[in-house]
Amino acid sequence: MTNTRKTHPLIKIINHSFIDLPAPSNISAWWNFGSLLGLCLIIQILTGLFLAMHYTSDTMTAFSSVTHICRDVNYGWLIRYMHANGASMFFICLFLHVGRGLYYGSYTYFETWNIGVILLFTVMATAFMGYVLPWGQMSFWGATVITNLLSAIPYIGTTLVEWIWGGFSVDKATLTRFFAFHFILPFVIAALVMVHLLFLHETGSNNPSGLNSDSDKIPFHPYYTIKDILGVLLLVLTLMILVLFSPDLLGDPDNYTPANPLSTPPHIKPEWYFLFAYAILRSIPNKLGGVLALIFSILILMLFPLLHLSKQRSMMFRPLSQCVFWILVADLLTLTWIGGQPVEHPFIIIGQLASILYFAIILLILPTVSMIENKLLKW
């Protein structure tokens, strides 16, 4: 008797990806975030779909429609806050997933890594456009400030910004197109995730030691399915605690004020997960320079495979690189804090130093330390 699981054209793809997939026997909980990101994406698409059923993308009614969802729709408040805080959980998992990749040298899977960086950009774009939709003060001014950055592009900048706006300011046309893009992009993300997995399954997973694990593989199911379920439980628990006890903890109070083009909020700042990049943007006095630094702060991830000079793949047995890695983490936390502070002394200089350190660690310090460790192996 043939096993349908292994012969059916469609089911066998699922089988090779989630059931009979050979996985290293020693991957730790840091490898759980891939499945958690998949779950986050599903939660976001489902809650987003139900929100879109009641939301109107018109400047006159957008804010009221969100209020209507929270007050009048059955469990609308739950759906709305699951969607808003689900985005935060998504980014927490993303940052940990990327951090894991950096620590254990997963970036040597070149295609998988680069698709991952493109995914990061796409998710950031989606989150930015989603933040504009409730049409509160921070939505409007955030959209104005961030889209305005494109005007720094020489020659075509101003035309480009007005083309994106669909007018001479952020208005009805902007909101409508942002809603359209915010709706379609998660499906683009889902397609990219498939490609990400396709490339990953060409090589198999990395593991904490960074060594080849072909000699010791175990089936994904039941070992890692049960392990993933634990991660899922913890993620859902954290999300629901956030949603049910302090849904506005990570939001901005200014977004409960309807958008008003005539009154600028005292401190315009994005959601917490963009603050590190926002701090880098603000730390450069020149507009174009700031925009380039902002883009390069994420794009620099693509350089990691080229900057890897160590003879070992993982940082597991490289204490010096470990120290530098954790300094980088501390630096990113510092940048996140600075991004939420007003532009005044001493925050300006702290932000500038943290920005310089960020690029210095990645481009200079980590490769140098890797070479020192290579030398130490010979002695």
Curated annotation (Swiss-Prot):
GO terms for biological process: mitochondrial electron transport, ubiquinol to cytochrome c. Signal peptide: none annotated. It holds the Pfam family Cytochrom_B_C. The lineage of its organism: Eukaryota, Metazoa, Chordata, Craniata, Vertebrata. The cytochrome bc1 complex contains 11 subunits: 3 respiratory subunits (MT-CYB, CYC1 and UQCRFS1), 2 core proteins (UQCRC1 and UQCRC2) and 6 low-molecular weight proteins (UQCRH/QCR6, UQCRB/QCR7, UQCRQ/QCR8, UQCR10/QCR9, UQCR11/QCR10 and a cleavage product of UQCRFS1). This cytochrome bc1 complex then forms a dimer. Heme b b566 binds at residues 97, 196. Belongs to the cytochrome b family. It is a multi-pass membrane protein. Changing residue 252 to E: In strain: Isolate S59. One of its GO terms (molecular function) is ubiquinol-cytochrome-c reductase activity. A ubiquinone binds at residue 201. Coiled coil: none annotated. Its cofactor is heme b. Binds 2 heme b groups non-covalently. It is found in: Mitochondrion inner membrane. The chain crosses the membrane at residues 33-53, 77-98, 113-133, 178-198, 226-246, 288-308, 320-340, 347-367. Heme 1 (or BL or b562) is low-potential and absorbs at about 562 nm, and heme 2 (or BH or b566) is high-potential and absorbs at about 566 nm. Keywords: Electron transport, Heme, Iron, Membrane, Metal-binding, Mitochondrion, Mitochondrion inner membrane, Respiratory chain, Transmembrane, Transmembrane helix, Transport, Ubiquinone. Component of the ubiquinol-cytochrome c reductase complex (complex III or cytochrome b-c1 complex) that is part of the mitochondrial respiratory chain. The b-c1 complex mediates electron transfer from ubiquinol to cytochrome c. Contributes to the generation of a proton gradient across the mitochondrial membrane that is then used for ATP synthesis. GO terms for cellular component: mitochondrial inner membrane; respiratory chain complex III. This is Cytochrome b. It comes from the Eukaryota. PANTHER family: CYTOCHROME B. Its main location: mitochondrion. CDD domains: cytochrome_b_C, Cytochrome_b_N. The gene is MT-CYB.
